[in-house]
Amino acid sequence: MESQAKVKISDKAEGIIERDVQNAVIGRREISLKVYHMGSGTPSRKDIIKAIIQAFASQENLVVVRKISTSYGAGISNVKLHIYKSREILEKIEPKYLLDRDAGTKQKKGGSKGGQGAKG
């Protein structure tokens, strides 16, 4: 367990690993990260994933950011993420919307408000 290890997210953000658990049954590593970003916005999912890949020698397609929660004005975010052993396991367990979110693609929902105002 690498408790209290530091991870550099960007020039303005640094994370401290608060919890690192190996879940052998599922085939993933479950990490809780506290990110300090005083004076700047919440780091993007892509920045967090890049930092985790470097820190844990993993691959981008095996890391999923489950949740980023930031209190207004605090400059501190709590991040929950998973690192999987294989893409196959990841796709069976993680919801598709999270995979799309981490990849930077958006899911298109049923109707759109933009199309309602443009009539004939």
From Swiss-Prot:
GO CC terms of this entry: ribonucleoprotein complex; ribosome
Source organism (scientific name): Saccharolobus islandicus (strain M.14.25 / Kamchatka #1)
Molecular function via GO: structural constituent of ribosome
Protein name: Small ribosomal subunit protein eS24
Keyword hit for Ribosomal protein: yes
Cross-referenced SUPFAM superfamilies: Ribosomal proteins S24e, L23 and L15e (SSF54189)
Family: Belongs to the eukaryotic ribosomal protein eS24 family.
Region of interest (Disordered), ranges: 101-120
BP terms from Gene Ontology: translation
